[in-house]
Amino acid sequence: MFTRRGFNIDALTVGETESPEYSRITISLSGDGYAREQLINQLRKLINVKKVEVLDDDCIKRELMLVKIENKPENRADIHFAVDAYRAKVIDYTNEGMCIEVTGDPSKIDAFIKLMIPFGIIEMCRTGIVALDRGTSTLLSKE
């Protein structure tokens, strides 16, 4: 459906919810308001879709990234300084490389990547965005 209609999806995340009978799909896409409305209309036509909601820009959103960085002795202090500054975690450490976990909004993840490029990124993987509205209302309680 997405390819046929020309939607440009930036990220797609699927996971469990508080209700075992439902999964939540978070779609992050770029495009104009018309493309967004077309996507919403197409999703609402699908039988298995319970609810479609567009979240406000001030919603709570997070992304997870794992990134492997070259572990050169001359760069270790600077890398660890960046890890601390970004509240990241070193989750694996060898003589050749280290794997760092970073969680935050997408702009934080992007900034961390730019900071790590000079040290040598070996490999990286991003989860895509997960998001919730602020407050106590839920997606299903808004019906």
What annotation goes with each model-predicted range?
Residues 1-143:
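A conserved regulatory-domain signal marking ACT and ACT-like small-molecule sensing domains
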